[in-house]
Structure formats: C-alpha cells, structure tokens
A protein has these predicted regions:
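Alpha-helix boundary/N-cap detector
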Residues: 9-12, 16, 81, 85, ...
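Secondary-structure transition/turn motif
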Residues: 53-55, 73-78, 121-124
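Amphipathic, interaction-prone secondary-structure segments
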Residues: 32-69
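Intrinsically disordered, low-complexity N-terminal regions enriched in serine/proline/glycine
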Residues: 34, 39-41, 72, 79, ...
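N-terminal domain-onset segments
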Residues: 1-47
Length: 171
C-alpha cells in the first residue's frame, strides 16, 4: 500500500497534465501557484495549484495537482485519482462548472452546514420544480443523508445569476 500521499496515486504524475488543464482553461484567467507562494505553503515542493479567477469576483475555482487531483468550488471538494477515467471526469466536472451546467449544492439544517455535492442538474430560473430538482440532486449524491423538514438548500454557480436558495417546507 502506498502511504506517500504526495507521490502519484494512479497511472501518471498529475503534473504531467498541467499543460492540458491550462489549455482546457484557456478562456479563463488562471494563476499558477507552487509551495513557495504564501497561501500555498501547505503543498509539497512538486505540487501545483491552478486558481481560475471568477469573472464576477465571487467564488474562484481551485485545482490542485498533488498525488491526486483535487478541485474546490465554494464548499464542494472533489478528488480524482491520476487515472485516465478520473482525469476524464475531472475535465468534465470543471467544464460543467465553468459552462454553468453544474454548481455546488449545500445543505444547511438547524445544526448548520451538513455538506456539499456537485449538482449537474441545474433548474432554470422559472423552473417551478427547482426545489424538487435540487432535492433530487442531493439525494442522488448522498442517498443516506436525510433532508429534514425546514432545512435549506443553497446552490452556488460560476455565474452568480444562477445561484438559488430553497427552504424545504416544514412538515
């Protein structure tokens, strides 16, 4: 078992994909960071971070290339092994977020934040069943997590005009 979490965790070294990812992000404003940048001093010397700056000045997208790939958007965090299959999913998820086809869906209850999932079934602004669509998205990602009555779902998207908040009805 490999216990060095900063060494490649799959078929290739994540740093090998930096150029491909920068091409994928070529329409965006991206900054590249290493372990010697003050905000990234938690990383190992060989690690890289790509920060995709939000054009609206709200939530940036952070992509870390360490022993595996990690993506952070709002409160959502996705992890992807350095395998062809996971790398393809990483590209798909990043593209969906940036194209406004996915967002970070968070659940809040009386006990506070309960978790966040990547929601790829975004309701339209006039969608009468938007709350149902978001509830379904949450339940598909976390089928064992109950959505208590009175809890709140918050969807954060790359384009803040798509953001939504829904209070689940009290029973």
């Amino acid at each position: 078992m490999n216990t060095d979490w900063n060494s490649p965790q799959g078929d290739f070294d994540t740093a090998e994909k930096q150029g491909e990812l920068l091409m994928l992000l070529s329409r965006q404003q991206v900054t590249v960071h290493t372990w010697d940048d003050p905000d990234f001093d938690y990383m190992e010397e060989q690690d890289l971070a790509l920060v995709v700056q939000s054009p609206s000045g709200t939530e940036d997208l952070l992509i870390e290339l360490c022993g595996e790939f990690s993506v952070f958007f709002e409160k959502w965090h996705g992890e992807y092994a350095a395998t062809a299959e996971d790398y393809a999913q990483l590209q798909q998820d990043i593209t969906a977020i940036l194209d406004g086809k996915a967002g970070a869906l968070s659940l809040y209850t009386e006990n506070g934040w309960q978790g966040t999932v990547l929601c790829t079934e975004l309701p339209g602004a006039e969608d009468a069943t938007a709350a149902a669509a978001l509830k379904r998205c949450w339940q598909e990602a976390k089928p064992d997590t109950v959505l208590p009555a009175g809890s709140r779902l918050e969807l954060v998207c790359w384009d803040p005009a798509q953001n939504r908040k829904y209070q689940l009805p009290e029973e």
